[in-house]
């Protein structure tokens, strides 16, 4: 019994430490690297090299202007010099709780750069190290009208007898943006261009601990790897270069992600690079030959918005994996599905968390019952076990043999009280990641003072209630710990957990509180059954 309690204490403390570390890191935004070289403007070093042996030329040094493209979920700012998306404001997401300001994902500030770039390079490319394509537009503001499903925004450039159109296609209610090139070759010679798309981001310093470091950085998917992170530190150490069918590249930022998705039927090259205090992760598509007098359309897509699993999964294979549940994904995914289903019924994420807790505890009830039954049987054997310790003294081998014989005769599994607890730990970790990764919980209210389930309880009421419920649950335990040191540790456990949970998301604390309350109820039901079997007697 003592060894099992020690294992439980150590396991709970270890899990609490890991979760606490991750919470601290997720809510400590990495600071940009201090450098005078980081600029919001394009530089020669930022342009990807073409796989073609020659490169086009640009005769102008024009300045672009910023145009606005808007639907019901975002507003994009696009620079006509190159056609880069230099800002994305998300209509349905506040910058902070109760703020009228919208969350800005892509942005182009001198010390905070996060831009989605794309262009045409190669032999006849219009985006080169000498300069970017200077597009013309019909207006400076484009808005998808109510009732309209789709809006096309063309940026046009005519150069050397070739008409280039960079067309942004936005849809109602979608963060998926088509970015297509329509090329009309009106000359008597064939031309060659190569499309690229890249995400430019200020290099950020790593923070956090070795246990579970924080992460804001790149990620990619290829034919051989469904999903893999590629951090800014890795970019600085080694440039990524992968040839793949289909694939995509992305930059992750907690609840949000931007991703370039090239033509999924083409052979693409994924790459990273660094220059001037900036990190780049992007793709190069295959070289496209446009015959004399002919035309070609080159397709790609840009996602810039929240991590919405279903929607992202429909845009590109494995893009939904950017909702990163870690190793517990196989548990977290069905838990999130259940959470979403319950929320659709009760229309409150706090009530949905309570519903999920009830379902999870209900499913685990047989394990809980087996745990308490095993512990009760072990308590009944304590007098015999103590007698063995006194009889065999230092002869540990003989004592172990006799103990195993006793367990077999009494049909008791000495690990029966521990194994169910170990099974429940991955579920708790999966729930933590579900609550931490679900953008749906960001700024989601419960009731009263809980207006953001993804943030800590501002008045610490839930953690205090959780600590009280844990203290009550401990006091209802039928057997005190024999070892004085272990008893002191167990007495402090509710306080330790309460302190840890002061800074945890309110949603996670709510889960633990409700779980404790349900455990108290289940415990009483189980004890009644054990009393009838003579395996338990109530404390006086």
From Swiss-Prot:
Q: Which UniProt keywords apply?
A: Cell inner membrane, Cell membrane, Chaperone, Membrane, Protein transport, Transmembrane, Transmembrane helix, Transport
Q: Show the InterPro entries listed in the entry.
A: Membr_insert_YidC (IPR019998), Membr_insert_YidC_N (IPR028053), YidC/ALB3/OXA1/COX18 (IPR001708), YidC/Oxa/ALB_C (IPR028055), YidC_ALB_C (IPR047196), YidC_periplasmic_sf (IPR038221)
Q: What is its main location?
A: membrane
Q: What Gene3D superfamilies does its record include?
A: 2.70.98.90
**Subcellular localization(s) per the UniProt record:** Cell inner membrane
> Is Transcription a UniProt keyword of this protein?
no
Q: Which GO terms describe its biological process?
A: protein insertion into membrane; protein transport
What are the annotated GO cellular component locations? plasma membrane
Q: From what superkingdom does this record's organism come? A: Bacteria
Q: How does it sit in the membrane?
A: Multi-pass membrane protein
Task: Name the residues that span the membrane.
Answer: 7-27, 345-365, 415-435, 453-473, 494-514
GO MF term set: membrane insertase activity
The annotated subunit structure for this chain is:
Interacts with the Sec translocase complex via SecD. Specifically interacts with transmembrane segments of nascent integral membrane proteins during membrane integration.
Its job: Required for the insertion and/or proper folding and/or complex formation of integral membrane proteins into the membrane. Involved in integration of membrane proteins that insert both dependently and independently of the Sec translocase complex, as well as at least some lipoproteins. Aids folding of multispanning membrane proteins.
Entry's family note: Belongs to the OXA1/ALB3/YidC family. Type 1 subfamily.
Kindly provide the name given to this protein in its UniProt entry: Membrane protein insertase YidC
Q: Which organism is it from?
A: Mannheimia succiniciproducens (strain KCTC 0769BP / MBEL55E)
Q: What is the lineage of its organism?
A: Bacteria, Pseudomonadati, Pseudomonadota, Gammaproteobacteria, Pasteurellales
């Amino acid at each position: 019994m003592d060894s099992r309690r020690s294992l439980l204490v150590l396991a709970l403390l270890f899990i609490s430490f890991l979760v606490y570390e991750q919470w601290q890191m997720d809510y400590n935004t990495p600071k940009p690297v201090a450098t005078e070289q980081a600029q919001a403007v394009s530089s020669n070093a930022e342009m990807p090299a073409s796989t073609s042996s020659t490169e086009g030329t640009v005769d102008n040094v024009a300045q672009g202007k910023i145009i606005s493209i808007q639907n019901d979920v975002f507003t994009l700012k696009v620079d006509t010099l190159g056609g880069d998306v230099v800002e994305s404001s998300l209509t349905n997401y506040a910058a902070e709780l109760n703020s009228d300001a919208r969350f800005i994902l892509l942005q182009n500030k001198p010390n905070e750069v996060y831009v989605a770039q794309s262009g045409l390079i190669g032999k006849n490319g219009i985006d080169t190290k000498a300069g970017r394509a200077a597009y013309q537009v019909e207006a400076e503001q484009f808005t998808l009208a109510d009732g309209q499903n789709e809006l096309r925004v063309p940026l046009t450039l005519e150069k050397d007898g070739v008409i280039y159109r960079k067309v942004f296609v936005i849809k109602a209610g979608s963060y998926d943006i088509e970015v297509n090139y329509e090329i009309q070759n009106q000359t008597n010679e064939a031309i060659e261009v190569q499309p690229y798309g890249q995400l430019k981001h200020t290099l950020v310093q790593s923070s956090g601990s070795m246990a579970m470091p924080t992460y804001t950085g790149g990620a990619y998917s290829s034919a051989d790897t469904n999903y893999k992170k590629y951090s800014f530190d890795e970019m600085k150490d080694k440039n990524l270069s992968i040839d793949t069918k289909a694939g995509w590249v992305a930059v992750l930022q907690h609840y949000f992600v931007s991703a370039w998705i090239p033509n999924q039927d083409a052979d693409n090259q994924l790459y990273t690079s660094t220059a001037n205090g900036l990190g780049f992760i992007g793709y190069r598509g295959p070289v496209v030959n446009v015959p004399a007098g002919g035309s070609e359309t080159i397709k790609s897509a840009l996602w810039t918005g929240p991590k919405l699993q279903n929607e992202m999964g429909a845009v590109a294979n494995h893009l939904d994996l950017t909702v990163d549940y870690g190793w517990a994904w196989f548990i977290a995914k069905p838990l999130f599905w259940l959470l979403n289903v319950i929320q659709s019924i009760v229309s409150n994420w706090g009530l949905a968390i309570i519903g999920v807790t009830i379902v999870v505890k209900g499913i685990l009830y047989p394990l809980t019952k087996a745990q308490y039954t095993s512990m009760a049987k072990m308590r009944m054997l304590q007098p015999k076990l103590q007698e063995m310790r006194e009889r065999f003294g230092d002869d540990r081998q003989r004592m172990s043999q006799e103990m195993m014989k006793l367990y077999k005769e009494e049909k008791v599994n000495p690990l029966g009280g521990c194994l169910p607890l170990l099974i429940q730990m991955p579920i708790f970790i999966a729930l933590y990641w579900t609550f931490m990764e679900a953008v749906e919980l960001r700024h989601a209210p419960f009731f009263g003072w809980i207006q953001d389930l993804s943030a800590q309880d501002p008045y610490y009421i839930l953690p205090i209630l959780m600590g009280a419920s844990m203290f009550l649950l401990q006091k209802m335990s039928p057997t005190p710990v024999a070892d004085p040191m272990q008893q002191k540790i167990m007495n402090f456990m509710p306080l330790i957990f309460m302190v840890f949970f002061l800074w945890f998301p309110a949603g996670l604390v709510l889960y633990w509180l409700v779980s404790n309350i349900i455990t108290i109820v289940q415990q009483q039901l189980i004890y009644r059954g054990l009393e009838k079997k003579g395996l338990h007697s109530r404390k006086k």
